[in-house]
From Swiss-Prot:
Source organism superkingdom: Bacteria
Residues annotated as the enzyme's active site: 131 (proton donor/acceptor), 135 (proton donor)
Record's keyword terms, sorted: Amino-acid biosynthesis, Cytoplasm, Diaminopimelate biosynthesis, Lysine biosynthesis, NAD, NADP, Oxidoreductase
Name of the molecule in the record: 4-hydroxy-tetrahydrodipicolinate reductase
Residues that, per the record, bind NAD(+): 8-13, 75-77, 99-102
Gene Ontology biological process terms from the UniProt entry: diaminopimelate biosynthetic process; lysine biosynthetic process via diaminopimelate
Similarity comment: family membership: Belongs to the DapB family.
GO cellular component: cytosol
InterPro entries xref list: DapB_C (IPR022663), DapB_N (IPR000846), DapB_N_CS (IPR022664), DHDPR_bac (IPR023940), NAD(P)-bd_dom_sf (IPR036291)
Length: 242
């Protein structure tokens, strides 16, 4: 049975993963780690580590992992380029899976949105994400991943075409503009819409998560799979084989 360490165990996702592991037949909890814990013990007792912490927590985890390489599943969002570079470097000596969303449905949404962006080149693209009032970052990491995918499908640099808000007399919408908008309220687990709009018709691709268990179960499946992989960076597409 695979021993999974939970890094960021006191957070919403950490608690959900702990709960889902109680009924998992292929894996069990090795240790619950949170800020101020013993990193050495976490690595010694775990076959795989799942990280849902904070950017600073992920940074600390990656630095320590170089001394005791273990497969890492990283789902922390809001990571900057420095941390992403550190992650890429660390993947030379251990398998690392990184995704802003562990839902298999979101992975398919991302795939379909990329294909639609390529096929519907004259359609305007707008992305809307909705989350609970407690979410700290905006736009969500998932929304940004979707935006990157649809921009790449059209050979566009997202940084040059992304819009995050509209107010006042701003003129007409530009052809390549990709809007990424955020709503916050209540206890919404997560909803993402990628819309393609043209005169006379529009297509909207939606994904709604109704429980954090969706993400937790996805992370556990990925952790079990990653434990058998060689050292390199992996994405949700590698896991799904698409």
């Amino acid at each position: 049975m695979i021993k999974i360490g939970i890094y960021g165990a006191k957070g919403r996702m950490g608690k959900q993963i702990e709960e889902c592991l109680k009924s998992e037949t292929q894996a069990r909890i090795s240790i619950l780690y949170d800020k101020g814990g013993n990193l050495g013990e976490l690595f010694e007792k775990s076959d795989v580590i799942i990280d849902f912490s904070s950017p600073s927590g992920t940074h600390e985890l990656l630095n320590y992992a170089r001394t005791m390489p273990k497969p890492l599943v990283i789902g922390t969002t809001g990571l900057d380029e420095k941390i992403l570079h550190l992650m890429q470097s660390a993947s030379e000596v251990m398998p690392i899976f990184y995704a802003t969303n562990m839902s298999l449905g979101v992975a398919v949404l991302n795939y379909l949105a990329s294909k639609a962006s390529q096929m519907l080149r004259n359609f305007d693209i707008e992305i809307l994400e909705m989350h609970h009032r407690h979410k700290k970052d905006a736009p969500s990491g998932t929304a940004m991943t979707l935006a990157q995918s649809v921009a790449k499908a059209r050979n566009l640099e997202l940084e040059k075409v992304r819009v995050s808000g509209r107010d006042g007399i701003i003129g007409e919408r530009s052809k390549d503009e990709i809007a990424v908008m955020s709503l916050r309220g209540g206890d919404i687990v997560g909803r993402h819409t990628v819309g393609f709009y043209e005169d006379g018709e529009f297509l909207e691709l939606n994904h709604t998560a109704t429980s954090r268990a969706t993400f937790a179960k996805g992370a556990i499946k990925i952790a079990i799979w990653l434990s058998k992989q060689e050292a390199k960076m992996y994405s949700i597409n590698d896991f799904l084989g698409i």
